Swiss-Prot record:
The keyword Ribonucleoprotein does not apply. HAMAP family: NDH1_NuoH. Keywords: Cell inner membrane, Cell membrane, Membrane, NAD, Quinone, Translocase, Transmembrane, Transmembrane helix, Ubiquinone. One of its GO terms (molecular function) is oxidoreductase activity, acting on NAD(P)H, quinone or similar compound as acceptor. PANTHER family: NADH DEHYDROGENASE SUBUNIT 1, NADH-UBIQUINONE OXIDOREDUCTASE CHAIN 1. It is found in: Cell inner membrane. It catalyses: a quinone + NADH + 5 H(+)(in) = a quinol + NAD(+) + 4 H(+)(out). The keyword Flavoprotein does not apply. Its EC number is 7.1.1.-. It comes from Rhizobium leguminosarum bv. trifolii (strain WSM2304). This is NADH-quinone oxidoreductase subunit H. It is an enzyme of class 7 (translocase).
């Protein structure tokens, strides 16, 4: 009995506790990411942004949460009620479940599986089903058009993201996210005789793929300038136009969880994860999770700057960029990286 408890029950309890702790921390972080997005957007427009609830508006997201929770959900008369309510739940659960394999620091991961990046790629591909369900079940033309746009957009840019992952796999030889970070201890900088630093991270050696992944991440998460599925000037609010109260909040939560995931993946694949910018003793004292958070916040800041300065693409421009530019370019980079690795004997 004792062996059964120590072998099965105790690890399950520990994993559930870790999952709940990660979930709470993630939800709080998403609340402040949403606040930061609004603050940055306001600063660009020379406004103050949310500044009433709490000091400097720090509790604004929690006030919005309470507002949504206490509102009555309204279901359109011709909507499929079950699918209409299930759609936001599917979206948010899939978005949150991907975080189980994301290492926030060395050893700070719930499930350190050897196909971590493949797991994230598979689960994030399923998130479009929640959007399609919501658009179809609303029984309205604007949500349905937004859902169709989202499906086409995500399929188009997932191909490029897949080729980016292949290039990283060729360089590292593993799909484990922890191994990908540890492989960036050495790289282009150490080959030139320099100490371990940010020059060893993949952003420099795989710079074209870094740019492709960054832009594809914007399209994958429906962020501007690729927010065609919820373009306010064309589709009002897109697939969310018939949603309000808690279901709308769950859609927004799933969207920002996916944004945070893409920022974290960019950090892991190209910015060295939890590694310090320079391998010196004073920077090594800083906990790895601090470096990870700083890098992820920097990537999100770049996401917000793109939203502020780049106008929305037309739908034909969006498709052309994905299929005629990123797809052949990423495929060519896979061939070039494989050729260089084989030529130099690093494969």
């Amino acid at each position: 009995m004792d062996s059964f408890f120590s072998t099965y029950v105790l690890p399950a309890i520990i994993m559930i506790g870790q999952s709940l702790l990660l979930l709470v921390c993630l939800l709080v972080f998403i609340a402040y990411v949403l606040l930061a997005d609004r603050k940055i957007w306001a600063a660009v427009q020379l406004r103050r942004g949310p500044n009433v609830v709490g000091p400097f508006g720090l509790f604004q997201s929690f006030a919005d949460l309470l507002k949504f929770v206490f509102k009555e959900p309204i279901i359109p008369a011709g909507a499929n009620k079950a699918v209409f309510l299930l759609a936001p739940l599917v979206t948010v659960l899939l978005a949150l479940s991907t975080w189980a394999v994301v290492p926030l620091a060395d050893g700070w991961v719930i499930a350190n599986i050897n196909v971590g990046i493949l797991y994230i790629f598979a689960i994030s591909s399923l998130e479009v089903y929640g959007i399609i369900m919501g658009g179809w079940a609303s029984n309205s033309k604007y949500p349905f058009l937004g859902a169709l746009r989202s499906a086409a957009q995500m399929v188009s840019y997932e191909v490029s993201i897949g080729f980016v992952i292949v290039t990283v796999l060729l360089c590292v030889g593993s799909l484990n996210l922890t191994d990908i970070v540890n492989a960036q201890h050495t790289g282009l900088g150490t080959m030139l005789g320099l100490p371990a630093s940010f020059l060893d991270w993949h952003w420099l050696s795989l710079f074209p793929m870094f740019i492709i992944f960054f832009i594809s991440a914007l399209a994958e998460t429906n962020r501007p300038p690729f927010d065609l599925p919820e373009a306010e000037s064309e589709l009002v609010a897109g697939f969310m136009v018939e949603y309000g109260s808690s279901p709308y909040m769950m859609f927004m939560l799933g969207e920002y969880a996916a944004v945070c995931l893409m920022c974290s993946l960019t950090t892991i694949l190209f910015l060295g994860g939890w590694l310090p910018p320079v391998d010196i003793w004073i920077l090594n004292w800083v906990p790895g999770i601090i470096w990870f958070m700083l890098k992820a916040c920097f990537v999100f800041f770049m996401f917000a700057m793109v939203k502020a300065f780049v106008p929305r693409y037309r739908y034909d421009q969006l498709m052309r960029l994905g299929w005629k530019v990123f797809l052949p370019l990423s495929l060519a980079m896979v061939i070039i990286v494989a050729f260089v690795l084989k030529l130099m004997g690093w494969a």
